[in-house]
Each structure stands twice: as structure tokens, then as C-alpha cells.
Amino acid sequence: MVYLASLIFVLIVNGIGIYGSNCPDQQLIEKSLEKVHIPGAAIIVINATHTLYEKAFGYQSLLPKQPIDIDKSIFALASISKTFIAAAVMQLVEQERIDLDTDVNQYLSEPNQRIFHPDYPLHSITLRKLLSHSASIAVSTQVQYTYFQPGDTAFTESLAEMCFKYVNPNTSFWLPISPGRVTFYSNEGSTLAALVVERVAQMPYMQYIKENILKPLGVDINKVGARIADFLNNTDDFVKHYAYAFNSSDVEGWNQAIPSLNLTQRPVKS
């Protein structure tokens, strides 16, 4: 789980009709958040060169009530972090260090651990297929739940250990369709793409992201991390996770499946 301070809810400028000094309607935003039961959000509107609008709404904690702080609140990015994987891959493509349609095994340099679909060994797993979620990788939800543990014990395996454990021809975690013919959302496929970045760049994936994406954007890398330990001095700024549910059993089910999210039932208005 990757965390990033300050932002993080980006609205596309053209999509909400902001031109010149116009700003989004505050009441509309507040009503929209309330409608889908979001306790709080930090919103920023940007174009290619400027920040046009930024504002915090609601709370990062309901009990006790603690408002979202545009400069301090720390959000878990979850799957939004996949955009960083794609950006990193495309940087290496632009540098001609990798090719989107080359078999990823060429970059992994693991002669004794090749990754391929067991039923379609001649169909290469490529970065294009990984980034488009069309590599036919289908690790079960039940297995994915085992990744999540309370606190900093989540994801103790390295990228390589995780990839070669679950994405290999000796497992059953594959769709019965050849790679490239079907789209199926895959966390493990994205992780494999991140491993390629790590191997080609010859540095830890997180270090690559900080040095080649975040620092050039002017992001304070001291406020970015993948573990709670990266934020020992400001853990109070974590935005709490809430589940909207009509009964506590729903929340209990989520907490059993993904305890690291520490979900809390949101009060339901009468």
C-alpha cells in the first residue's frame, strides 16, 4: 500500500468546466461526497502548468472529528499507485531501455524461473499485456486477501518473491484463454511490471519512483512511503478508512478479509 501526503483526488479540468478564475461549486462537491458517503476528500484541479483550485472537504477522522488538511492529511493510494507503474514503464520505453512487446523474461534475467501461461507457453507475457490487464493472470480473491495483514507486516515479500510465487506456470492462477485475448484486472500483473522496472533500472522500485517521478514534480519525498514506519512522526495525519454499511456484520467481514484497512462502520443517518 502506497501512501502520499496532501492530495489526492484529481479532477480533470475539461471534465468540470473550469476556465479562467471559475471554481467548482462547493455545495455541489459537498453534496456529491455526502451522496456516496465519503467522509472527506482533498481536491485539486490542475492544467499542464498551474494549480487552478485546491480545497479540503470533510473529515479524515469522524471519531474524534479531525478535518482533512490539504497540506498534511495522508491518503492511502491503493490501486491509484498503478499509474506510477505505468509512468515508470513508459519512461524506460522513451529511453529505449525496454520495449512494450518484448517477453518480460528478457528483462527479469531469471533463467530458472520463467513466467508464461502453462497452457499457452508460446504466447509471451509482455509489458503491454501487463499494463492493459490482458496477460490472462487471475490470482483468486481469496489468495489476494492473504497479502493483507495488520500494521507493517503486509507485503513482507520482495517484488520478485511475490511475482515468482504466484505468477508462474506451476500455479492455477491463469485464465483458460491465451494472453492478449481477454481483459481481467490483475494486481499481480501490475506488480510484475513494477519488477521489470526494478530490474532494468537496477534499483528498488520505490527508489525509482521517488527519484524519477516524484522529485522532478517537486513532491517532498519525505512525505511518501509504502509502510507506516515511513511516517513515524506523523501517523496522526493518516486518513482513516470507513465502510458504509447497514449492519456491523458487513464491516466485520471486510475487517476479516483485509484487516490492514481497519475499517469502521460509518454512522447511518436516520
Predicted region positions:
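Short, surface-exposed loop or secondary-structure junction motifs
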Residues: F116-S270
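N-terminal signal peptide
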Residues: V10-N22
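Classical eukaryotic N-terminal signal peptides for Sec-dependent ER targeting/secretion
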Residues: M1-I8
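Active-site SXXK
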Residues: I29, I43, T49, A76-V104, ...
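Short linear capping/connector segments at secondary-structure termini
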Residues: Y59-L62, D71, D103-Q113, Q144-P150, ...
